[in-house]
Amino acid sequence: MPNIETRAATAMTLITSADELTPWEVAWRQLAEARGNPFVTPDWYRSWLEHYDEDAEPFVIISCDSTGTCDGVLPLVRTGGSALRFAGADIGDQFHPACHESHELESTRRACAVLREHADEWSTAVFHGTEIDSDWLSGLRDGGSPLRVVTGLATAMPYVRTCVNSNGTPTGQSVAGSFERTCARARISCRRTTMSHFDDLKIAPSW
């Protein structure tokens, strides 16, 4: 994995303009590719923002470590004036912060400080296509910004891990093969249980 772009900045940054995203996109893309998830890349984010909901506003929280290195991105948008959600969650499969899996909890806890600081700019956060037992959701619940689960609606969806070649770009054959294997596992899983692995979560501030 190439070196992630660094910036001498504060630990957390809130992006509310599409133009402000550009300096962070290299680091953001590297983090998303390391997780193998195209739905949390800046490319997916911009495409959805430009073509699916032109009224949505960026609400992207950038997390940096003590050296100023970007180590996490929470790629949210604000819709309807006050609701936060992942960009394209209504048409994508799985969503989570773009960060190393082992950093999800800490990165999200730091993002809570931003949510609390800007509490007057949003009223509800709706997270579709997320794993209900993931570390990052735990971070939202206990990260210093009091959030509570309002509803949980189960919807099972397949998840395809994007394979990349040596230069970091996804390969068509690997994606197709990954999808085929994912579908096979999904069929086996559906026969064994009726429980969903993914849930739609609606989270709201409780202050």
What residues fall within each predicted segment?
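N-acyltransferase acceptor-side catalytic subdomain
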Residues: M1-W207
